[in-house]
């Protein structure tokens, strides 16, 4: 009962995160739900950038690759290497998922620093990187959790759950809590880093608007890319762990 109670509290904590707010928000009413409209707008922009770039780069493949085709081939090779390293020989079906996570987070993070979101005025709140909202990072983390549970169950069936009593049943509560805390760490790490980066830039621009914020912005671009790599690498590692049965 204690384990079940802790698990329920952890899930409730993840649900309650959707109510966390930093600053003002532009709400849309969809049925009985209120959603953060500015997050949907910026997410659609990021998706449009990714789809548009991919379409332009690979719509007419060349034997001698163009710059765009070469870039996308390099990114694909990089994602395949990350997936193979973390998941193993059965990495193939998971490349699209890991690649989608990496590219969406990478472009979302960079959009917060490079796109002039502040030009567009909203009735309430302001536009920012999608990953600057806790709802986005929690959603990505929960997708990752669903993916590694699916990977483990599809590979081992119900025998997958035997890992919770290995190497000894005494560790059952710890093993269960470990799986429920993974999405917490993934979501808070990404959200905290992106929010902190944007807040630092805003504060420096307000204090010293000329030169000082520029190095910080370049550092933010670097850390934004690193955060995308960390998230996708951990997602691949969790999937590989569930398929191999490593604890």
UniProtKB/Swiss-Prot annotation:
Keyword line: ATP synthesis, CF(0), Hydrogen ion transport, Ion transport, Membrane, Plastid, Transmembrane, Transmembrane helix, Transport
The keyword Zinc-finger belongs to this UniProt entry's keyword annotation: no
Record membrane topology: Multi-pass membrane protein
Highest taxon above the source species: Eukaryota
Disulfide bonds: none
Membrane-traversing stretches: 33-53, 95-115, 134-154, 199-219, 220-240
UniProt KW Membrane keyword: yes
Gene Ontology biological-process entries: proton motive force-driven ATP synthesis
UniProt GO molecular function: proton transmembrane transporter activity
Subunit structure: F-type ATPases have 2 components, CF(1) - the catalytic core - and CF(0) - the membrane proton channel. CF(1) has five subunits: alpha(3), beta(3), gamma(1), delta(1), epsilon(1). CF(0) has four main subunits: a, b, b' and c.
PANTHER family: ATP SYNTHASE SUBUNIT A, CHLOROPLASTIC (PTHR42823:SF3)
Family: Belongs to the ATPase A chain family.
NCBIfam families the record matches: ATP_synt_6_or_A (TIGR01131)
Function: Key component of the proton channel; it plays a direct role in the translocation of protons across the membrane.
Name of the protein in question: ATP synthase subunit a, plastid
Organism: Cuscuta reflexa
Gene this chain is encoded by: atpI
